[in-house]
Amino acid sequence: MSDITTTIPPDDASRKLTVANPDDADMRHLSIAGGTYTILVTGEQTAGRYCLTDMLVPSGGGPPPHRHDFEEMFTILEGEIEFTFRGEVLSAGVGATVNIPANAPHSFKNKSNKAARLLCMCTPAGQDEFFLSVGDPVASRSAPPPKLSDAERFERVQRAKALAGKYRTELLV
């Protein structure tokens, strides 16, 4: 019988407990891809291990096809989301968890007639910083997205394309 010992590092007392409520006034809410994304837990809070985002996706909302070099996991809290993964389409409803492997092409869309809500965890962290770089701040999770002209929408897409590589992401549009 082998004696396997694992040494667990000491507690890092500089790291604090994180309690996040998406409706708290100090949360950062961003309008992205037609939805409202609330950054619940940042990479800074987890020493880069992961980030967690609450996504409110309206009917018809969702990002374009893309891929990145990190894992992305979604848990559906409300509604139904249609995922496209390597060209295959899959619908996921309340309670389902969908894991997207690193580097795999994918997208998602809310095809229903009501808003959907999901949690998105990325590991390692970094997607939170991408969202903060490309999103438009909004006052709350339920605030409407800003009314953008066609030129402003085009500028947002160009900004996302320009910054994607910095955040280990490739937009496939």
Segments predicted by a language model, with ranges:
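Structural motif
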Residues: 36, 73, 80-82, 89, ...
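A contiguous, mid-protein "functional segment" used to position or interact
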Residues: 114-161
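A short, N-terminal "cap"/entry segment at the start of jelly-roll beta-barrel domains
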Residues: 1-49, 147-173
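Short acidic-glycine-tyrosine-enriched beta hairpin
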Residues: 20-21, 80, 87-105
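Short histidine-centered beta-strand/loop micro-motifs
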Residues: 41-42, 62-68, 109-111
